[in-house]
Amino acid sequence: MKKNLTAAVFGMIALSIGAVSLARPVSAAWKDIKGLPDVRSWESGNAVIEDAVSAVCIDWSAGDIDVICGEGSSLLIEESSEKEIPEEERLCWYLSGSTLYIKYSSVKSFFHFGKSLNKHLTVTLPEDSRLEKLEIDSSAGDVNTAVSAEYLEMDCSAGDAVIRTEDPVKTMDLDFSAGDISLEAGEIEKLEIDSSAGAVEFSAAGIGSMDIDVSAGSVKGELTSFDSGEIDISAGSLELKLPSDANFTMKADISAGSLNSDIPFQKQGKTYIFGEGKAKLDIDISAGNVNILEKQSIGQ
């Protein structure tokens, strides 16, 4: 009996030690990247990076994230917390070519499972920077970005997001489990938004194609133009602000709710034709109203 008890104790100790040694695994999304070393060999702590950076990839477990542009010529990585950050829990970062990887670090043991320190990450890019890619994976915390990137990907489990960008974006892919999304952009070639619970509000000068899927929450959009789009809402309303000369064909399937429009249209069954009907928009609303509003011109 004593031998079994001793073995169990040593087993628990080994488990806790193992948990510590595995507390900093490389993100699953990064494991297949050639040449990316084990995170234990990365640099740690706040940093000033003088080298050119074309892509930023962030994996953050607990705390808010800000990605902004500054006035200097260097890239700054800073984390802060209401509590003192132990040396072994400082963020990890690695520069592979011109791609910067930043990872939340938390040394956990069996006896401290689930206790992650809430840390605020701020990444400040050089003035007038334009990234090829910005990728953010956040488990819990709000995200704020005000930078230029050709490709923007966000995967957030719990937290709101505010996204501001004026320069053209090729692809923007936002996947949120719980949290509101606020987006202001210029031209976007391809926009994909998947939200399980939360409100979505976006405005853009123009969108090539858009695919918006919201399980529970309202969607508000303001557009100058678009080529094609699909909007699927299980429970929530849809409001679109469009120019008075909007030119699109909309197929609407609304199970429980009504459709109202300030812009004239021709109706053919479940199809609504605005102008000559050039662009295509399919909407599917299970429970909620659809409102098409006229976008006010500047000066009105």
Show the residue positions of the predicted features:
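Hydrophobic residues embedded in beta-strands of well-ordered beta-sheets
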Residues: 75, 98-100, 259, 290
